[in-house]
Amino acid sequence: MLYGARECARLLVNEGMDAAVERHRLHGEAMASGLSSMGLELFGDQSVKMNNVVGVVIPDGINGDGARTSMLEDFGIEIGTSFGPLHGKVWRIGTMGYNARKDAVLTTLAALEQVLRIGGHRLTPGSGVHSALEVYA
């Protein structure tokens, strides 16, 4: 655990605090924009959200745990569930650390789109990735 903490500190010092905060802000914004464009409701007050995770309400008719399993088994992407009264109602999609990268955001959005479409969620194909790319432009 101490080695991991040391490595994290080393990476942060090398990148610089301001650059790390900005990187997480950018990728968090791109993820949130992409999810919204897919017709998903973002969970919570977005004016006070964190940049490193996006809460998203699981759409009606979608099996949240089944979708998470498909994301992991089919695409190698893990998204989080919620706990307590929000379990089965909200996913947590991280954009922190290694996942605070353009390719990770775009791949996650594309994979989630496929899983949702297979599950019956109606959305405009490519809308999530397109919206995220506009944030990056």
Descriptions of predicted regions:
Residues 85, 89-137:
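PLP-dependent enzyme catalytic core of the Aspartate aminotransferase-like
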Residues 12, 53-55, 92-97:
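Short glycine-rich or small-residue beta-strand-to-loop segments that form or flank ligand, phosphate
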Residues 1-29:
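Structural signature of PLP-dependent enzymes
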Residues 72-79, 113-116:
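A common structural junction motif
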